């Protein structure tokens, strides 16, 4: 199990052990930097939401992990993938009463309503900016656009701000990604300078 465990920090600064896992390594995209790209000849697999929820709660109950870091290749479409992630987190939170930490990757291109549902179930959301320019994105990740990546990042930021206001003001208000938002950028795969 150790190879699937990573560490992260909660909103209150605690370091937690997380099960870091993909919902699936199937992907409709052909990003040149990704081992799970459509054109790469690799063995494919996918969890069902129930399988992944059961695996997570089993590890949690044995004290192997304190939370989940859930990402995914894009299976069929961004919406379909996000729906499966939501179903997994919903099973964990509502059926298994999982109170551990959850970091989920928002899927660019998914319906904003699905991103909202994901953020209400997860402690932290992230959406990878991938590359510093549209030109590099077009060359290395031809199926993605800067807009499809920046749109959910902006939505997450705005909903976090609104949620912080509501939680401070109204008793029982639902928290949206209370531990924040993060992103990742690939450095060195494209010709941009640090300044750019």
Summary of predicted features, one role per range:
Residues 1-24, 38-43, 96:
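N-terminal [4Fe-4S]-dependent radical SAM core
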Residues 23-28, 128-132:
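Short connector loops/turns at beta-strand edges and beta->alpha or beta->beta junctions
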Residues 38-68:
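Conserved alpha-helical substructure of the radical SAM core
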């Amino acid at each position: 199990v150790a190879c699937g465990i990573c560490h992260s920090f909660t909103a209150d600064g605690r370091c937690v052990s997380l099960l870091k896992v993909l919902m699936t390594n199937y992907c409709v995209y052909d990003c040149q930097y990704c081992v799970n790209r459509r054109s790469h000849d690799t063995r494919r697999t996918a969890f069902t939401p129930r399988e992944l929820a059961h695996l997570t709660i089993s590890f949690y109950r044995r004290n192997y992990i304190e939370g989940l870091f859930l990402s995914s290749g894009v299976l069929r479409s961004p919406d379909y993938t996000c729906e499966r992630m939501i179903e997994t987190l919903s099973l964990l939170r509502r059926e298994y009463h999982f109170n551990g930490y959850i970091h989920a990757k928002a899927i660019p291109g998914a319906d904003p309503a699905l991103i909202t549902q994901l953020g209400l179930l997860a402690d932290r959301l992230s959406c990878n900016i991938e590359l510093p320019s549209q030109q590099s994105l077009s060359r290395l990740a031809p199926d993605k656009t800067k807009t499809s990546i920046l749109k959910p990042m902006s939505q997450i930021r705005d909903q976090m701000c609104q949620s912080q206001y509501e939680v401070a003001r109204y008793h029982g208000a639902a928290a949206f990604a209370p531990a924040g938002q993060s992103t990742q950028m690939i450095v060195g795969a494209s010709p941009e300078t640090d300044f750019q």
